[in-house]
């Protein structure tokens, strides 16, 4: 797998990635492909901690010099944390999309839903 699509993560077709944490929460961000399409990110709106989101529900917004795009909840659950550094440094979603550029953490309503998401290989097929 390319470094731009880490093998240990899960993905959805709307270009969000998910990482299952040891405590059972799931960290969510936008993929390298998404940030590349958007260009220089200048604004990020995150969901509220405590929000209960349905899968595929709008969870936030990301705006770049080229476009604005919604960020979706890739899995149903409760938002338990947001990346408070991101709104003041939105370019982090460009420079480190799988690390410091994460968007929010969600406690899944049904943890088994995670297993049905796209693997890195499947996501690579979606973006080729």
UniProtKB/Swiss-Prot annotation:
It comes from the Bacteria. Its cofactor is (R)-lipoate. Pfam families: GCV_H. The keyword S-adenosyl-L-methionine does not apply. The modification N6-lipoyllysine is found at residue 66. Residues 25-107 form the Lipoyl-binding domain. Transmembrane segments: none annotated. Binds 1 lipoyl cofactor covalently. One of its GO terms (cellular component) is glycine cleavage complex. One of its GO terms (biological process) is glycine decarboxylation via glycine cleavage system. The glycine cleavage system is composed of four proteins: P, T, L and H. Belongs to the GcvH family. PANTHER family: GLYCINE CLEAVAGE SYSTEM H PROTEIN (PTHR11715), GLYCINE CLEAVAGE SYSTEM H PROTEIN-RELATED (PTHR11715:SF3). The glycine cleavage system catalyzes the degradation of glycine. The H protein shuttles the methylamine group of glycine from the P protein to the T protein. This is Glycine cleavage system H protein. The lineage of its organism: Bacteria, Pseudomonadati, Pseudomonadota, Betaproteobacteria, Neisseriales.
